[in-house]
């Protein structure tokens, strides 16, 4: 049972909150920003349909450098 619990925890995503400082990889390299919104239902962003749920939310993040708004799953983010 301990092994099963350890494996489950290994793959659990970190939960983030509005205002958290995070970073992620982009085509231009590592980017950092602040979470401004959390989506727990499917939503449209910049012409694309993003899938989100209570179990796997997506986050809107405002870039510190460019003010660009990006949408990512928690698995793509690193808390700063």
Give the location of each predicted region:
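Basic/aromatic-rich interaction segments and small domains that mediate binding to polyanionic partners
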Residues: 13-75, 80
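Short, Lys/Arg-enriched N-terminal segments with co-localized hydrophobic residues
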Residues: 1-11
């Amino acid at each position: 049972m301990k092994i099963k619990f350890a494996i489950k925890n290994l793959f659990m995503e970190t939960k983030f909150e509005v205002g958290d400082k995070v970073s992620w990889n982009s085509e231009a390299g590592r980017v950092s920003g602040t979470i401004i919104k959390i989506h727990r239902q499917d939503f449209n962003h910049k012409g694309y349909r993003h899938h989100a749920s209570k179990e796997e939310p997506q986050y809107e993040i405002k870039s510190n450098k460019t003010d660009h708004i990006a949408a990512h799953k928690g698995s793509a983010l690193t808390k700063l």
